[in-house]
Amino acid sequence: MNQMNPAFVMPDVQSTVDTRQIPIQRVGVKAVRHPLTVRTPDGSAQPTVGTWNLDVHLPAEVKGTHMSRFVALLEENKAPLDSSAFRALLTSMLEKLEAPAGRIEVSFPYFVNKTAPVSGVQSLLDYEVSLMGDSRDGATRLFLKVLVPVTSLCPCSKKISQYGAHNQRSHVTINAELIDDVPVEDLIRIAEEEASCELWGLLKRPDEKFVTERAYENPKFVEDLVRDVAQRLNDDHRIVAYVLEAENFESIHNHSAYAVIESDKRLR
């Protein structure tokens, strides 16, 4: 059995000088699953599980980064996450890793309690959310991404058919660069309000009737959907840039209809 000699000092290999003199733009840990809580608009905290990617810039003369410190950072920071806490976490990582630049990204399921439109029955609906922060040259950029499932109904199908119209589930994905706090619910509502109809986790028959008729009265091509959401994002002063995607999982085809709008308000 091995026994540690009290006088023995373990070598710190990753802190030695690297003679190849090649900097590494991003080095760290990826796909770390770790519990977290997310601050909600009413001030409460929602528990969930995050998948984390954390990395830093490594100077040319340093052999390796301190890999264990990334996970230690998550263990030490368990306060509910919002944009200000996320910025503080990014700053703490740079200090802990002694790095000039770095990036943190976390993805997690986020649940919203929704009320059915007619019966009033309540149920949870899940959304895929990501927060990403990038810090370099003394500046920090923060991004909020959310995937919102909705319903779309085809205007052409409605126009040419004597009854009915093909409809399908669609995904609206908003990846917004923020200059001010934006609750994730705000982006969710924008996408849902501009779709043919939103989704609920639980519906009774009167609700199904409402959803069917609502979508029929509000038909949209994928082009309509992405443009209508883009108009809302253009008018939001808290968002400085965005990448917006809409994908319709066509019910009459074995392929999707797809549209993307990218915008950076700083370039206007």
From Swiss-Prot:
GO molecular function per UniProt: GTP cyclohydrolase I activity
GO BP of this protein: tetrahydrofolate biosynthetic process
UniProt pathway annotation: Cofactor biosynthesis; 7,8-dihydroneopterin triphosphate biosynthesis; 7,8-dihydroneopterin triphosphate from GTP: step 1/1
Leading EC class: hydrolase
InterPro entries per the UniProt record, alphabetical: GTP_cyclohydrolase_FolE2, GTP_cyclohydrolase_FolE2/MptA
E.C. number(s) listed in UniProt: 3.5.4.16
Keyword Cell membrane: no
Site description May be catalytically important, residues in chain: 154
Catalytic activity line of the entry: GTP + H2O = 7,8-dihydroneopterin 3'-triphosphate + formate + H(+)
UniProtKB keywords: Hydrolase
Primary role: Converts GTP to 7,8-dihydroneopterin triphosphate.
Similarity remark: Belongs to the GTP cyclohydrolase IV family.
NCBIfam families (alphabetical): PRK13674.1-1
Listed name of the protein: GTP cyclohydrolase FolE2
Gene from which this protein is expressed: folE2
